[in-house]
Amino acid sequence: MIDRYSLLRPWLFCLDPEQAHNLTLKNLDRAQRFGLLQRLVSKPIADPQNLCGIEFPNPVGLAAGLDKDGKHIDSLAALGFGFLEIGTVTPRPQAGNPKPRMFRLPQAEAIINRMGFNNDGVEACVSRVRQSIFWQRGGVLGLNIGKNAITPIEDAASDYIAAMEAVYEIATYITVNISSPNTQNLRALQGEDMLRSLLRSLDDARKRLSDRYGVRKPLFLKIAPDLDQNDIHLIADLLMEFNIDAVIATNTTISREAVTGMQYGEETGGLSGAPVRIASNIVIRALKARLGVQLPIIGVGGILSGADAREKIMAGASLVQLYSGLIYKGPDLVSECAKALRQS
């Protein structure tokens, strides 16, 4: 598939990035419906991993952001991922930021986006999840939740709780996204006082939902790469204090050091792809040093090869997630990473 994708990529890269994204997913859906995907992609790699009481068929997952609304679950699952994470979804629908809001930087194998949590709202997403064959067959599906842009940061907990309540019954795990740079003031939730308050509220809400549904769903927290050692230690300590089950490291970066002087390099938004790899690994190592074996880490950021995936595991991650690497390397990156991790 990578050879085929290398033929398609120049054509896709002539299109607006968001248009190319949507067109690719629509064609992926068509291929899946007609049974073509199974012929085009490698057979899924079996390498089971058990974390947080969840059996992951292999350690390579899809990061949130590629399928924000759960419209493409079955076709993405056919690419061989061990788990999918969809979203970010918010309690109410929102359009996100004005277009253009996604930019490619091919020289750096990077993407800048300022999407702004554009989504159809959590209820629409839940409905689509229920209709997916992947979910009906028990596939590992994470739901990534956020707050609406119009919700004051002081009231963020109410949005996260509303979204958590909506997805609780259908999610294998729930990821709390407090690290996108594209919603005003969202990263302030990573500060000590606000994070403590938010995690306390989420822990209490999860206890109520566990009683209601008779099952305790794992809660993950997704953090930024733009944190210093003290920030990382503080977050790690709060994760343990408030019973968060895992941490996803990391989201996109606001740093532009690696893309200075490049076309679109100064666009506002989060930078992903190859330039975030080292920063993500630094955060993973710092988290591992603080958390030890008490809380697992999911590594994401700059994985464009099997070697990059192994590097995340060596840094301290237990699982990895892909997004920007798929844009540059194509769907066979999934099996490449899964094979590399099985052999390591």
From Swiss-Prot:
Membrane topology term: Peripheral membrane protein
An example Gene Ontology biological process: 'de novo' pyrimidine nucleobase biosynthetic process
CDD domains linked to this entry: DHOD_2_like
Catalysed reactions listed for this entry: (S)-dihydroorotate + a quinone = orotate + a quinol
Catalytic residues, chain numbering: S180 (nucleophile)
GO molecular function, one term: dihydroorotate dehydrogenase (quinone) activity
Cofactor(s) of this protein: FMN
E.C. designation(s): 1.3.5.2
Residue sites binding substrate per the record: K68, N113, R114, M115, G116, F117, N177, N182, N251, T252
Function: Catalyzes the conversion of dihydroorotate to orotate with quinone as electron acceptor.
Protein name from the UniProt record: Dihydroorotate dehydrogenase (quinone)
